[in-house]
A protein has these predicted regions:
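Active-site neighborhood of HAD-like aspartate-dependent phosphohydrolases
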Residues: 1-46
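A short, structured active-site edge motif that brings together acidic residues
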Residues: 43-44, 70, 125-140
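Short, acidic loop-to-helix structural element flanking the phosphoryl-transfer center
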Residues: 81-106, 112-116, 144
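Helix-loop "lid/cap" segments that line or gate small-molecule binding pockets
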Residues: 28-31, 51-64, 118-121, 150
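Conserved H-loop
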Residues: 37, 125-129, 157
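Conserved Lys-Pro-Asp/Glu-containing loop-to-beta segment of HAD-superfamily phosphomonoesterases
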Residues: 7, 143-171
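Metal-dependent phosphoesterase signature
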Residues: 57-95
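Acidic, Mg2+-coordinating phosphoryl-transfer loop and its flanking beta/alpha structural elements
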Residues: 162-201
């Protein structure tokens, strides 16, 4: 699918899927399992970052090595799975996807074997040329390498890519492949942090697609 036309890569958690409340709830299960403090939605959005082990260590006030993070990651995902059926798509997710004129794909740092059937459950599979999730047993890492592999499988040049996501890590991943990012304020990251990044920022997914079209047109 090697093409000079713009290609849109969507993030899933906190972007197309409105799961912020569930993520914060599951994160607090992790923190309280070690006797740590809980965080509010706003606190999570200010402090959350990848690698997630660094975020956990900051809140807990103690080092979190790989073995400990693996254990905490299992606790998180067990709690997350129990509430997943309560999550809905972002209010304008379907409208936003329909507004993009070119090809689009989905890349998530959630486990691939769970992501694919979940996307199908929401009736979205047909919108994407490819759906990729994490193919490892422990999550929490950064997105750049996964994006490189995702685009290689698609045979898409990174310079033709715009990524819509809700985190600074999404933007860093896009830059790493020579692409562009539009950041969405409805997810896991405080809007002030997103705006300070210098990347285009949108309060709705529909507006994010509009901005993605603008930045992709400017690069052509």
């Amino acid at each position: 699918m090697n093409t000079a036309h713009p290609h849109l890569v969507w993030d899933w958690n906190g972007t197309l899927l409105n799961d912020l409340s569930l993520v914060v709830s599951a994160t607090n299960v992790v923190f309280t399992s070690l006797g740590g403090p809980t965080v509010t939605l706003d606190e999570h959005r200010v402090r959350f970052r990848r690698p997630i082990a660094e975020y956990y260590a900051e809140v807990l006030g103690q080092a979190v090595d790989d073995d400990e993070f693996g254990r905490l990651d299992r606790i998180f995902h067990d709690a997350y799975r129990t509430g997943l059926t309560t999550c809905e798509l972002a209010a304008d997710a379907r409208t936003a996807m329909a507004a993009w004129p070119g090809s689009q794909s989905l890349l998530s740092m959630w486990f691939h074997e769970e992501l694919v059937p979940t996307v199908h459950t929401y009736g979205l599979t047909g919108h994407f040329t490819r759906v990729d999730g994490l193919r490892e047993t422990v999550g929490g890492g950064r997105k750049a390498e996964s994006l490189q592999l995702h685009l290689a499988e698609l045979d898409v040049d990174g310079a033709s890519v715009v990524l819509i996501g809700d985190s600074i890590d999404d933007a860093d991943a896009a830059l790493a492949v020579g692409g562009r990012a539009v950041l969405y304020t409805g997810g896991f990251t405080d809007p002030a942090r997103l705006r300070a990044s210098g990347h285009p920022v949108a309060d709705t997914l529909t507006d994010a697609v509009r901005l993605a079209r603008e930045v992709s047109s400017a690069d052509r």
